[in-house]
UniProtKB/Swiss-Prot annotation:
Record field: catalytic activity: a 1,2-diacyl-sn-glycero-3-phospho-L-serine + H(+) = a 1,2-diacyl-sn-glycero-3-phosphoethanolamine + CO2
Organism in which the protein naturally occurs: Desulfitobacterium hafniense (strain DSM 10664 / DCB-2)
UniProt subunit comment: Heterodimer of a large membrane-associated beta subunit and a small pyruvoyl-containing alpha subunit.
GO-annotated cellular components: plasma membrane
Protein name: Phosphatidylserine decarboxylase proenzyme
Entry annotated with the keyword Lyase: yes
Amino acid sequence: MIKYYDRKTQTYQIEKVAGEKMIRWTYSSPVGMRLLETVVKKRMCSSFYGWYLDRRISRRKIHPFVCKFDLDLSIAEKNLKDFSSFNDFFYRKLKPSARSIDPCQDSLISLGDGKLLAYEDINLDCLVQVKGLTYSLKELIKDPETASKYKRGTCLILRLCPTDYHRFHFIDSGICEPSHRIKGSYYSVNPVALQKVAKLFCENKREWSIFHSDHFGDILTIEVGATFVGSIIQSYTPHQPVARGDEKGYFKFGGSTVLLFFEENKIKIDPDIVEQTKLGYETYILFGEKIGVRHKGR
């Protein structure tokens, strides 16, 4: 059971997890862990399933998925019958009216929909995966010089489960450098898996880039793939100016995670999100929602 905080209702909710029984069996049983290490985490497994989900025959999975998780497709650009495959449905675009971006330029907005954790004044060599398991930023991006810029900064971790909107966006105007790709495995990023696999983010396939934002400094953005995420698609053009809210990219099928690292004294996260993180709960947020502010005097 995964419990998260809904800041709109100020209540705790239970997450509906796609494939929950299989995830728990895989990461909690000797046979499941053996299957995970020999088959599931491999690129071939995710690539094959991704190939299937790109095929027209996979359309038959869409309606049952929508019904099971009570998804609102009235906010999607396409109608249900117009999706060419399950992946086409999975990384669907939303109507412009579906999400509103906080109008204040000093507001730090969410890059997408998902469950958020926020850590301030971070120790780069002891980043929290879950309680008792840590990793370092140097291990994560394999670039010590870049990592050192974020000493005592802020780390945001946005987890996108399979039922979420799977496109991610720029949180400010600015210019983004090219993305660096790091090969890796395909472990699930579900909290169950995070408790079982040490340094999971450092093990999985991932991409990172530096976004030179106009109001929040140089932001390190890291997209982490997961089980059955065959592709992390970067839809932006490097070195070209972008506007606040412009799309940066999207994930194909699977749960995924985006991490943002901010330099010291650049932002202040909203107190409710920080408090829930300290209590061990993720906070559910939507793209464009205010999650913090620019640090005064910066």
